């Protein structure tokens, strides 16, 4: 094993082992698909991501919402489903402030039009554009409106479901969900349930002032839900180039672009941008910023040239993708990524940085883009880090790692590495400091 302060490996000078093609964990041949149900119109399809979300069908008994509202619009099981929502909601209060509240049954909305605006603010805690009571699912066909949700203290959320499924067919490029608060807030939140999005083309931003835990998309599911409908995953079909998710904390830790607290994250294709940025300089808190996080597995299809996952922190630990349990290595969680034409970046001022890290195995397809990790403190940095096996297709892009005082490894596989480095591929590790070491490949 080579070790030096700076180690650079070019594919033109090295022939690695034969490439290993990476695939998706849940292939169409192995995964049941329920999209063949006969319905008048289906507003969302998640093509066999391992779980198909609730489908939304148009019917003739829907009620439209237009005009202006300065109080919460409550819906119950006895009310008609909503058709097109084009209203403006201006609702302010001190706690549990909502634009639309699904109190029973299923909150079904055909479309939230582009001229719909949710201005919901709390002078203390708990502000929601759309919210439900316990056991109520949310089913939205198309979302094109604007959500401006704020709380002076904690828990501002654009859309929250307290049921088993929060399903949105299409979030259009006109859609905007803007969240501001000072602690624990979310763009879209499935509490004790699953979050399904067919197409993500809009913009979601969550900005916290002094506190912790900003999440763009969040599923907090059932810890015991290991089989069956899996009410704990985040599933996205197509993440378009116009789509973006940003989760930022000005002074706190816990920034997450997409997080499944107990389940999986599955994305068919990524052409948009996912960013997690933590302004915390607290060196006692690990896992400060993560672009995509899942307790179980992460399955990410191909990343186009415009696709990116970025995690940055002024404090401890930044990961572009992280699969596993934050408290240790009790889980064997895997990451599968298709071809990478875009960029995966992680930057930490004090703690560990890794483009992608799994507590199990990590598989990546061909790499023509960039995967990088850097730690400016005396901490480790890894381009790709697998506690077990690491496999890649042909690398014709760049995979790099840099640290100011510890170990840097571009490719790290605890149980071995299988890769092919193409003629234009660059595998680079840079480590500065007397005790620092750099490895292009380390196993």
Where are these regions (language model features)?
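Surface-exposed loop/turn motifs in large extracellular/passenger domains
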Residues: 58-443
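Gram-negative bacterial Sec-dependent N-terminal signal peptides
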Residues: 1-57
């Amino acid at each position: 094993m080579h070790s030096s302060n700076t180690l650079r490996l070019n594919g033109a000078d090295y022939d690695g082992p034969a490439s290993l093609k990476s695939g998706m964990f849940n292939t169409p041949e192995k995964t049941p698909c329920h999209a063949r149900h006969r319905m008048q119109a289906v507003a969302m399809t998640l093509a066999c991501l391992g779980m198909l979300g609730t489908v939304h069908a148009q019917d003739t008994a829907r009620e439209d919402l237009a005009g202006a509202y300065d109080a919460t619009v409550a819906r119950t099981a006895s009310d008609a489903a909503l058709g097109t929502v084009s209203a403006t909601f201006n609702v302010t209060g001190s706690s549990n402030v909502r634009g639309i509240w699904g109190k029973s049954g299923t909150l079904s909305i055909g479309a939230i039009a582009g001229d719909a605006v949710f201005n919901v603010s709390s002078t203390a805690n708990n502000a929601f554009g759309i919210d439900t009571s316990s056991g109520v699912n949310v089913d939205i066909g198309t979302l094109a409106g604007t959500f401006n949700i704020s709380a002076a203290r904690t828990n501002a959320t654009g859309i929250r479901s307290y049921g088993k499924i929060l399903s949105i067919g299409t979030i259009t490029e006109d859609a905007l969900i803007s969240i501001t608060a000072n602690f624990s807030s979310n763009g879209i939140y499935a509490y004790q349930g699953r979050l399904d999005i067919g197409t993500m083309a809009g913009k979601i931003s969550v900005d916290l002032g002094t506190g912790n835990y900003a999440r763009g998309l969040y599923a907090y599911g059932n810890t015991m839900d290991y089989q069956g409908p899996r009410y704990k995953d985040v599933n996205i079909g197509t993440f378009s180039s116009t789509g973006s998710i940003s989760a930022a904390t000005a002074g706190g830790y816990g920034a997450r672009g997409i997080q499944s607290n107990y389940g999986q994250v599955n994305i068919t294709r990524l052409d948009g941008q996912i960013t997690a940025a933590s302004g915390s300089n607290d060196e006692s808190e690990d896992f400060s910023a993560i672009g995509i996080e899942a307790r179980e597995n992460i399955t990410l299809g191909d990343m186009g040239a415009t696709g990116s996952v970025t995690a940055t922190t002024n404090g401890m630990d930044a990961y572009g993708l992280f699969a596993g349990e934050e408290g240790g290595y009790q889980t064997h969680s895997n990451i599968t990524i298709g071809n990478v034409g875009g960029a995966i970046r992680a930057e930490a001022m004090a703690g560990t940085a890794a483009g992608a890290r799994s507590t199990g195995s990590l598989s990546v397809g061909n790499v023509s883009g960039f995967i990088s990790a850097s730690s400016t403190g005396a901490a480790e940095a890894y381009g790709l880090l697998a506690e077990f096996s690491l496999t890649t297709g042909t690398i014709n892009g760049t995979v790099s790692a840099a640290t100011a005082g510890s170990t840097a490894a571009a490719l790290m596989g605890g149980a071995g590495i299988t890769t092919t480095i193409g003629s234009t591929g660059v595998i680079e590790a840079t480590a500065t400091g007397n005790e620092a070491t750099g490895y292009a490949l380390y196993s």
